[in-house]
Each structure stands twice: as structure tokens, then as C-alpha cells.
Amino acid sequence: MAQGRPTTNTLTPADLSRQQMTFQTGVVLDAPPLLHQFGDVKTDAAARYTAGQTVSVVFVTGHPKNNLHRNDTFVKVQRLVDGAWKTVAVDGDWSTQYRWKRVFGAESEAQVSWAIPAGTPAGTYRIVHQGDARNLLGTITPFTGTSRSFEVN
């Protein structure tokens, strides 16, 4: 590197994942609140925002340990382009936040926030939450929730 040449590294770190201990319990059950389904919006987006404001949506969700969404995402911010939804941000972006909490017993909520960056093009947007819920028999089922569409000016 010091002489402008790449280094060659032949060492591969050992995979210790099977030897790691965890004291966290597994997920026993997820249940939506009465009269709700997984993916339902409990607190929706407003109709209009400007760059610099934060959109916040609360979804009925399952425990995130049901599926860690590696190589996937819990959150998508999408923009309507030529009649189709295009993803412009995911949960790995600095502008988004995904906050999960157990509300009561087996009920959970996910608060998804998007701090609209400066320079965001005007248009129609929405927030999508992807999650997974575990029933009493241990079956894990994916679901999707979508906010109302909103305008960014």
C-alpha cells in the first residue's frame, strides 16, 4: 500500500458463529392488536412535507428476530416515477430509522421515520414496512405494510 501496490492477504478469519453464546430468548408468539392485522398502519404520514422535515409512520409488526432481513430491508421509502414505485431509501440509509418495541404481551409496533434530505426531488412518496410474524405453532409468515402516499415539495 505504501508503494501504491495492493497487498495480498491470504488469511481468512475463523467462523466462530456456532461458538457464540446468547442469553436472549427466542420469539414465542406475535399477535396483532384486536381488530388489526400485521402491516396495518396505526399512525400514518401527513399529506405534505418539505425537505428537512421527518415523516414518521407506526406499523403493527412482528418481532424483528423472526427474520433479520439480511440482504433485504425492513424499510423502503419509495417515489412514484412514471406510474411505478421506485425505492429511493432503505433501512441502511442515514435518513431512515426503524424502531421496534413490544407494546403489550405479544403485540409489537415499528416506528419508521424518514428525515427528508435536502435536495430530495419533489414528488409523491410512500413508506413500506416489511416484516415477519410468528404464530403459536412457530410458523413465520411475511407481511408488508404501506403508508398513505404523501407529497414532498
Region roles according to the model:
Residues 88, 112-114, 148-152:
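Generic detection of short hydrophobic beta-strand segments and adjacent strand-loop junctions
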Residues 48-112, 128-131:
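Contiguous segments within soluble domain cores/interaction surfaces
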Residues 123-127:
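Exposed beta-strand face motif in extracellular beta-rich ectodomains
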Residues 2-64:
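Short, compositionally biased P/S/T/A/G/V-rich stretches that sit at domain boundaries
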Residues 135-153:
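Short beta-strand elements
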Residues 113-122, 134:
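Short, surface-exposed loop/turn segments at beta-strand-coil junctions that are enriched for proline
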Residues 68-70, 120-122, 143:
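A cross-taxa feature marking solvent-exposed loop/turn segments within ectodomains of secreted
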